[in-house]
């Protein structure tokens, strides 16, 4: 009985859940790239004789590669077997760490993080996995997406201290080599769980309960896609202000960088809970309403940063912020699955997710520039609130269109 249930490729089945946990593991390991890059910044800068700004180049290249690679791999997994694509990507990803660990010139180190680790490696472990899991669940699709996309928050909670401990014990070169060998030995094994093709790849045929409209919400498909991309940029420009600058904010306030790092870890931990809770809620109310709910909650949390500058109030606000914003990004994947053909899920979800990453990069840069001009983070928070209002306006507009056209947002798309 158990074996037959596991062998079944039905949606929401036993195999679908096993596939989900394997995908979560892959996404979590895929987070090593971002956090090893940031933790190794100071020792790398010392070894190569670089300024902080110069030593930040690998992170910048990684972020660009991670975002652009999400679009590429979204397209690739829409056309080829997910496991095959991820197997190749995981081998490139692990090898990238080995290249970086032996780099004799800084440009080789930087390119290693941008190309094999970022664009060709880690990018395959984010949006393509979200798209893949969305094809395997119907009744609990939102909850499943919330679980798998928690991987990057889990990575943010566990990899920085582990990477720091490895660097302290081995030095940054051997630490990166150890990470590379770990990735090469673990990720290919997990990809074996993803070998089966999705149960339904088309929107036609027996058992299909919902056919994606040719004009979702009355728009051309690319119009809705564009609105989701703009919303993704807007929400993450706002989201990036606390996530990228909370440590610097605490230093400016005289609270110490250690407390800032603890607040960031608290945000990440609360973000995991938020993604699970929001996923469960989205199965009840649909993607559009979940997006609007998350946007409103994030707006409230961002506003709470303005009147408080004490240690304990900022811990509380950081926790509230983490709980508020975790459901926004997963809602885009759910909206895509509710309104577009299943066969397009890979590249459409990959594109929207990549725009959220571009929003994080843009927001972090904008907030830093605003701080440099004004000398405080108050204007940067106001800037984030403005972008959040843009995101909320798009969410309200899309939900209004759905109601106006008597199209009930559904989670039945297959």
Report the location of each language-model feature.
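Helix-to-loop junctions at the C-terminal end of transmembrane segments
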Residues: 69-82, 275-286, 371-372
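C-terminal ends and interior cores of transmembrane alpha-helices
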Residues: 91-104, 297-309
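Cytoplasmic helix-loop-helix junction between adjacent transmembrane helices
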Residues: 113-150
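Helix-loop-helix hairpin linking two adjacent transmembrane segments in secondary transporters
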Residues: 148, 152-198
């Amino acid at each position: 009985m158990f074996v037959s249930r596991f062998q079944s490729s039905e949606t929401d089945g036993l195999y679908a859940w096993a596939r989900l946990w394997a995908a979560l593991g892959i996404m979590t390991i895929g987070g090593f790239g971002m956090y090893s890059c940031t933790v190794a910044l100071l020792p790398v800068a010392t070894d190569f004789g670089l300024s902080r700004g110069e030593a930040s180049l690998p992170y910048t290249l990684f972020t660009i590669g991670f975002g652009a690679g999400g679009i590429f791999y979204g397209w690739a997994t829409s056309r080829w077997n997910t496991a095959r694509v991820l197997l190749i990507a995981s081998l490139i990803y692990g090898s990238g760490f080995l290249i970086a660990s032996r780099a004799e010139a800084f440009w080789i180190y930087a390119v290693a993080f941008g190309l094999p680790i970022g664009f060709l490696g880690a990018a395959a472990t984010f949006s393509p996995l979200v798209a893949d899991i969305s094809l395997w669940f119907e009744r609990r699709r939102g909850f499943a997406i919330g679980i798998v996309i928690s991987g990057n928050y889990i990575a943010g909670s566990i990899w920085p201290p582990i990477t720091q401990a490895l660097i302290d014990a081995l030095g940054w070169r051997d630490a990166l080599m150890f990470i590379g060998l770990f990735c090469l030995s673990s990720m290919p094994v997990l990809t074996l769980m993803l070998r089966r093709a999705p149960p339904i790849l088309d929107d036609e045929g027996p058992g299909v309960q919902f056919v994606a409209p040719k004009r979702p919400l009355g728009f051309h498909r690319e119009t809705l896609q564009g609105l989701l991309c703009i919303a993704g940029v807007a929400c993450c420009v706002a989201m990036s202000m606390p996530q990228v600058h909370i440590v610097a904010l605490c230093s400016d306030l005289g609270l110490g960088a250690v407390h800032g790092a603890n607040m960031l870890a608290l945000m990440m931990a609360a973000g995991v809970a938020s993604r699970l809770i929001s996923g469960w809620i989205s199965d009840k109310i649909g993607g559009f309403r979940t997006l609007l709910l998350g946007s409103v909650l994030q707006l409230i949390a961002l506003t709470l940063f303005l009147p408080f500058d004490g240690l304990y109030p900022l811990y509380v606000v950081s926790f509230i912020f983490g709980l508020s914003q975790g459901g926004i990004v997963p809602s885009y994947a759910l909206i895509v699955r509710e309104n577009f053909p299943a066969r397009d899920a890979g590249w459409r979800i990959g594109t929207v997710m990549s725009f959220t990453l571009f929003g994080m990069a843009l927001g972090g840069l904008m907030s830093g520039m605003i701080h440099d001009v004004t000398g405080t983070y108050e204007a940067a928070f106001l800037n984030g609130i403005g972008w959040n209002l843009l995101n909320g306006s798009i969410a309200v507009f899309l939900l209004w269109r759905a109601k106006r056209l008597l199209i009930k947002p559904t989670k039945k798309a297959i």
